[in-house]
Amino acid sequence: MEDEKIIELYFERKESAITETALKYGNYLYKIAYNILLNNEDSEESVNDTYLGAWNAVPPEKPRIFSAFLSKITRYISLNKWRSKKTEKRGSGEVDLAFEEIEECVPSNNSVFEEIETKELAKMISDFLKKLPETERVIFIRRYYYFDSVSDICKKFGFSKSKTSTLLCRTRKKILSFLEKEGVLDERR
């Protein structure tokens, strides 16, 4: 079913909206949640919470890009669940690793999470990413937004682990340099 029709079902408050959303986007949303949580049960719960979040948000919200709207809800719910579990016990995984890698670009003594949620910084980084070549931008987003593992990215793009890691490292350095030039970070050199 087309996204416009699914959104129409939400506006009509028909429960089939959730069924259609699950049929079309369930696997996609589960992958996002699982990349963050690394747990089947928690991932399924995040996806179900996403459906509830969409139900509560539409209407009045009318998403332009439904998949992006849903992925944002799933990511937010999954990261909150991950944070609460992390405070309960120290864990490791792609989310921890991705945050460690990107932490050098975040400008403050505050936690990475607080800084990433800062709208102004997010907009600056988003604008910067739009200027990158498509492959570089997509790889960066797959790693640091969707938390794909480096090996998954290698498979998807047909690159070696070394090439992918180097590309990510160079992109992080470009962002760091950009943020320094914009005055967001003190120059570290």
Give the positions of each predicted feature:
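DNA-recognition helix of helix-turn-helix
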Residues: 65, 79, 125-126, 136, ...
